[in-house]
Amino acid sequence: MFFENSAILLCALLSIAVGYTKSPFMSLMYSVMLFINSSFVLMMLGFEFLALVNLLVYVGALAVLFLFVIMLLEIPATELRAYSRGWSTLGIFVFIINGVFQITPSMGPRGIITGLPGAESITNLGHALYLYFADLLILNSLVLTVALFGRFAIAPVRTTGR
């Protein structure tokens, strides 16, 4: 129970830090840490597939894209070092306070699929998507296809200067 509460509290603190930091580089680092921590929380809750997708999509693709944009801003190194003072002490303090004030005992492993013996969450997600929600999945694919064709229809045609 201590690790679950600590991870959720860290998610809350990181989401506040993303909005309140003044440096775009530190805001990006806090958002990457937030995505990694949220995938850790999803993994603890039993959503393994969503945790892996969260890591692959957000941390992998968006972080690399934003890092290239931030590298183009050319922020001085002295400004980056000024933002890292004092945050480790605050993190250790919050971790200790959370451990001291634990009220409920540890309840053991919990997940979303405790009633089904031998089934994994990815298998259950596949059964739910392709058996029960197949019509919504097909409708979603049609909407995305229309959006793709709409993007090409609306985009202006560029001509060369000849």
Swiss-Prot record:
It is a multi-pass membrane protein. The chain crosses the membrane at residues 1-21, 32-52, 55-75, 87-107, 129-149. The keyword Metal-binding does not apply. Belongs to the complex I subunit 6 family. Its main location: mitochondrion. Gene3D superfamilies: NADH-ubiquinone/plastoquinone oxidoreductase chain 6, subunit NuoJ (1.20.120.1200). It is found in: Mitochondrion membrane. It catalyses: a ubiquinone + NADH + 5 H(+)(in) = a ubiquinol + NAD(+) + 4 H(+)(out). Keywords: Electron transport, Membrane, Mitochondrion, NAD, Respiratory chain, Translocase, Transmembrane, Transmembrane helix, Transport, Ubiquinone. It comes from Chlamydomonas reinhardtii. It comes from the Eukaryota. GO terms for cellular component: mitochondrial membrane. GO terms for molecular function: NADH dehydrogenase (ubiquinone) activity. This is NADH-ubiquinone oxidoreductase chain 6. Its EC number is 7.1.1.2. Core subunit of the mitochondrial membrane respiratory chain NADH dehydrogenase (Complex I) that is believed to belong to the minimal assembly required for catalysis. Complex I functions in the transfer of electrons from NADH to the respiratory chain. The immediate electron acceptor for the enzyme is believed to be ubiquinone. It is an enzyme of class 7 (translocase).
